[in-house]
């Protein structure tokens, strides 16, 4: 068994066994798998598998289950698409100012990822917009109008070589 402490769970100790880790790894690879197929793969009864999955959801091990769209296909459908990786440095880095920018950034639907980073810029954003006019509108809304934004450096994707969502889990 692997004991994991996480302050996000109010310091409640959660214990994951080998079956829980296999279940999480399988769901990371394909969350659309049916409970029966998942149970068969893990050699569990369907009821036990469902109970474990619900527990992992309730404890916060699984944040959400989504369908990941092909950015290439969506780009073809729309005729274009712009992905920008943006470094943002703030003028003042007090906790309340960092939190204020973060709150505004995560409310933007164009922002797919928002990371506080160190050293270097204060934030890294991954932004997906349909075209350059939409990018300009986004930057004016989030970056230009914020007096605390000191520096912005944007990089535009010309090719996505890899995109993954799986987290490497320990083996029991």
Please place each PLM-identified region on the residue numbering.
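A compositional/biophysical signature of low hydrophobicity enriched in polar/charged and small residues
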Residues: 1-172
């Amino acid at each position: 068994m692997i004991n994991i402490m996480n302050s996000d769970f109010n310091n409640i100790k959660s214990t994951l066994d080998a079956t829980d880790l296999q279940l999480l790894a399988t769901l990371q690879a394909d969350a659309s798998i049916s409970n029966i197929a998942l149970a068969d793969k893990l050699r569990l009864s369907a009821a036990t598998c469902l109970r474990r999955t619900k527990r992992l959801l309730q404890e916060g091990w699984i944040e959400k289950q989504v369908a990941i769209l092909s950015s290439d296909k969506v780009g073809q459908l729309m005729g274009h698409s712009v992905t920008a990786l943006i470094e943002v440095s703030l003028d003042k880095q007090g906790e309340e100012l960092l939190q204020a920018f973060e709150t505004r950034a995560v409310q933007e639907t164009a922002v797919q990822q928002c990371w506080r980073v160190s050293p270097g810029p204060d934030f890294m954003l991954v932004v997906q917009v349909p075209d350059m006019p939409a990018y300009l509108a986004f930057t004016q809304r989030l970056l230009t109008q914020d007096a605390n934004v000191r520096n912005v450096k944007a990089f535009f994707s010309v090719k996505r070589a890899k995109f993954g969502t799986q987290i490497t889990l320990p083996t029991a």
